[in-house]
Amino acid sequence: MKRLLTIIALAVAVTALNAQTPKDVKYSFTEASELNLIGKIIKDTPNPYHRVDTVKYKGFTKGENSQVRSSAGLAVLFKTNSSVISVLTEYGYMNKGVNTMGVSLRGYDLYIKKDGEWLYAASKANSVGKEDQNLVLVKDMDDSMKECMLYLPIYSEEYSVKIGIEEGAVIEAIE
């Protein structure tokens, strides 16, 4: 009986893992900072995902310095006709706090506009140790043009955030 339950559990786990990332999708990536990045306190920073230029503005404690380099409150506005939206992130500092969920520390929130209203579409974060992998946020959507708002991680620093769409689809900045 234990063996049967183990086999069933493994089959379910493998099926769930296969459902996460579409296998036959070829991705095209666009750096998020090339689209419309909103929510910044100071527009011109050496790293587009920092809220404050810590080279220019000194006097922060270690904790404050880490916080102003995180992307809390930043979002990317874009439109796409892709049926899949993913994110490929290069982290500078990735918070791994034990008292906060991974989706807050290093995850993304995606909203899609429908009938003039932003609707929640997905929240996801890569597992610890798999931060460099392509994170599929949504899949199996229709190929109509969708306006999207992607909130960046709250408690981590990013060097690069690339939005992945399927090859042949378009992605453009929106206001």
Which residue stretches match the model-derived regions?
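Bacterial Sec-dependent N-terminal signal peptides
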Residues: 1-23
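N-terminal secretory targeting modules
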Residues: 20-175
